[in-house]
Amino acid sequence: MRLLIVGAGSTGGYFGGRLAQADRDVTFLVRKGRADQLKATGLQIVSPHGDVALTPKLVTAETIASPYDAIILTVKAYSLDAALKDIAPGVGPKTMIVPVLNGMRHVDSIVAAFGQDALAGGLCSIAAALDDQGRIVQLSQFHNFVYGEMNGSRSERIEQLDAVMQNAGFDARLSSNIEQDMWNKWMFLATLAGVTCLTRGTIGDIAGAPGGADFVARFFDEVVSVASAHGHAPGASFLDPTRALLTEQGSTLTSSMYRDLMKNSPIEADQIIGDLLARGKQAHVDTPLLAAAYVNLAIYQTLRRPNT
């Protein structure tokens, strides 16, 4: 199975690098600057699960020569439109597109560009970042990749992808309910991003503040109410451990959006918070804390000066 990994940053570079190390047929679609860096230094991963150093196969949008069996989209949500244009030469009638973007807005964009049949569901969980040398540094132990057909079927193509993903150096799982899994991740991520960005603190900082745990619980309840109103109510197996994780005393947990905000970097405010707020309004769900978080992030985006 020929895989095209769109992006070789901390997410695409990590999972794609592990797949390449496991001798899977992996090519990375990258911009010229990242391509030049990878040609000079190779793709390097620094990880508690073992370091990786390899010479990756690379293409740019201008040099894609033929369709791929599967395309894994790992770009930030605000880069999706450009990525969909870039991958077009690599999409054939049987190509499967597996996005691991945050939120759910990207689903409609992919279907509009390439049709419902091209889309499969996906999500990943990893804490990683690029260092000043362009190496991918894994910041914690977890490295999970979940995928499945949006209708829950066990198609031939998804089983082929599962065979490629298994035993590739990370935790891989074929899901029979990937759409709910994607919503569950969105609920967790929206709450984590919203509360850490609003307070400029870790989960432990918030939990230790007067009223902090109650604030997080109310924020999470708003998010869950929106998901439930759209037919994606989570079960207790998600709710109970997630509530505990989000209110843990002493936790150093933060969100990637918070880390981006503190670095004056672009953020996925519209896709993670704004879209959820809009869906709440559509369903007549009252979400004052979500609204406060979105106003806060919108002001940051307005005032932000791009890094030079």
PLM region spans:
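Rossmann-like NAD(P)(H) cofactor-binding subdomain of soluble oxidoreductases
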Residues: 52-135
